[in-house]
Amino acid sequence: MDKKVLFEALNTELAKKNIDLEIICVGGFVLEYYNLRGTQDVDAFYQEDAKIISIIEKVGNDFGVNAPEELWLNNSVANMNRIPSRSICEKAYSYSNLTVFVPPLSYILGMKLESGRDRDRQDAGDIIKLVKIRSIKDVTNRLKEYGFQPDLSMILEVFEIAYGMEWLAEYMTEHPDELR
C-alpha cells in the first residue's frame, strides 16, 4: 500500500486532535522511498504516547494494514538503534500536523550492516549498487562519521553482494592499503 496515503490519513487524525508529530523513518520504508523494495510496516523514531499510539492504530485499522503483533507505524527500532541526526535527513512529506523525514541511504547502509541479518546484508548490497558506491574506504569513513563502528568483513561481504567476487578481488589488489 502507498505509504503516502497512510501518512495523509495519519495527518488528518492528528489534526483532529491538534497534535503535531515528527517522525524519522528508517529500515524498509527508506528502501521503498528510494525504489529499492517494498515493505509492510514503517519503522520510525518519534515521541510516542497513548494518544499517538491510538491514532496510529486507528489509521492502520481503517486501511487494514496493522499486523496482529505490530502497528503499521512503530518505533520499536528505538530499542536497538541510534536515531539519525535530523541534519542529515531530508523531508520526505510535510503536512499540517505531520512531518516525515528520511535519512540518506548511506545511513541505512550502516543500520543494515550493524544488524547483520541475511536480508539486511542483501539490502546493504543493493544500496551500494544503487548509489554506485565504489570505495570501501569512503564507506567506512562515512559510517564512522555517523557513529557506526563498521566491521570490515561485513563491508567486504556486501561489496561482493553488490558487484561480485571478481570486482572485489580486483579492488583489493588495487587498494591494498585500504584493508589494513
Give the ranges of each region predicted by the language model.
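Compositionally biased terminal segments of proteins
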Residues: 1-180
